[in-house]
Regions:
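Short helix-coil junctions and helix-kink-helix linkers
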Residues: 107-125
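Short, Lys/Arg-enriched N-terminal segments with co-localized hydrophobic residues
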Residues: 3-15
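Short amphipathic alpha-helical interaction segments
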Residues: 121-136
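Short, cationic-aromatic polyanion-contact patches
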Residues: 145-154
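A short, conserved structural fragment
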Residues: 135-145
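Short acidic, glycine/tyrosine-flanked loop/strand segments centered on an H-E-D-like triad
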Residues: 93-112
Length: 154
């Protein structure tokens, strides 16, 4: 489990996280998260048995899957960036704004050489759904404004 791998106890939240989060990141007890603007709710859990291991995101009835390694890779990129970065969320069919987390999550220059999203047609919105989990895990700080939110590594 990601939490144990990083030394973060199950049931993250409270002092370990920058935001209050419920759930432990399993299919049976997923993390309950909110979008950076606070207007949308969704769930995430890690599926380490998947090939490749996946971060499963459920938004209403839509299920998105991202490579689980995106958490470590994004944290490392943000540490090297050493400043705030715009999230820039966009659907797969729309271009991502240059220099955003969304653009990095689909760039040929990232560690996986392209999309972290695993299901064609549902590979976007990386910049919307992954950063709040990064914040909950204590890996990043995320702004919570109505729009144009940013992230930086902790």
């Amino acid at each position: 489990m990601y939490g144990r791998r990083k030394g973060i106890p199950d049931g993250i939240g409270g002092e370990m996280a920058a935001i209050e989060v419920h759930g432990i990141g399993t299919k049976e007890d997923p993390w309950q998260l909110k979008t950076p603007s606070g207007t949308g709710e969704y769930q995430m859990y890690q599926d380490e048995a998947a090939d490749p291991p996946a971060l499963v995101c459920t938004v209403g009835t839509t299920v998105l899957r991202y490579q689980l390694r995106c958490l470590d890779d994004l944290h490392e990129m943000l540490r090297k960036h050493a400043d705030w970065m715009l999230l820039g969320s966009a659907d797969e069919q729309k271009p991502a704004a240059e220099g955003t987390v969304e653009a990095w999550g689909r760039s040929a220059e990232n560690p996986v050489g392209g999309w972290y999203g695993l299901k064609k047609g549902l590979r976007g919105r990386f910049g919307m759904y992954v950063p709040p989990l990064m914040e909950a895990l204590g890996l990043a700080e995320v702004e919570h404004n109505p729009k144009n939110n940013r992230i930086r590594a902790i």
